[in-house]
């Protein structure tokens, strides 16, 4: 939980810098590029995270990597601060929190809609417009199928879940009957 708090703090700071520079989207892409590089190169990630290597050596490696990625000065400086403070290992969590804060700033909500059967385009658009009306934000809906729901839909927006599935309703009825 502490790592999430740390990640949110750094992500919020970078989003604020991005907003000041009008580069929120670009910073998100650049942070994602660096995170993908670390995810794809375990040796690089372990060197940058390891306390066994001198900070000067890690700074030089990071500078070389940043030069090859051609990131903006702000994101490069941000990543150097993370390295200096021993927080470079939090980059994936920071990138995730950054995306959440950037969406908030842009008025975007990204719900996940799970249904028992595939929805057609009209149904997806109907759900999108209903969610946009309810949230007052632009909706970028992700739809998936889970046949275990039996029927109905489950909508997850951030940490809130709206469960209108038949499976949940049957479970509730079963609980009521068992309690008698």
Curated annotation (Swiss-Prot):
Location (main, coarse): membrane
Signal peptide positions on this chain: none
Name by which UniProt lists this protein: ATP synthase subunit delta
Assembly, per entry: F-type ATPases have 2 components, F(1) - the catalytic core - and F(0) - the membrane proton channel. F(1) has five subunits: alpha(3), beta(3), gamma(1), delta(1), epsilon(1). F(0) has three main subunits: a(1), b(2) and c(10-14). The alpha and beta chains form an alternating ring which encloses part of the gamma chain. F(1) is attached to F(0) by a central stalk formed by the gamma and epsilon chains, while a peripheral stalk is formed by the delta and b chains.
PANTHER family: ATP SYNTHASE DELTA CHAIN
Superkingdom of origin organism: Bacteria
Alphabetized UniProt keyword annotations: ATP synthesis, Cell inner membrane, Cell membrane, CF(1), Hydrogen ion transport, Ion transport, Membrane, Transport
GO molecular function: proton-transporting ATP synthase activity, rotational mechanism
Compartment list: Cell inner membrane
HAMAP family according to UniProt: ATP_synth_delta_bact
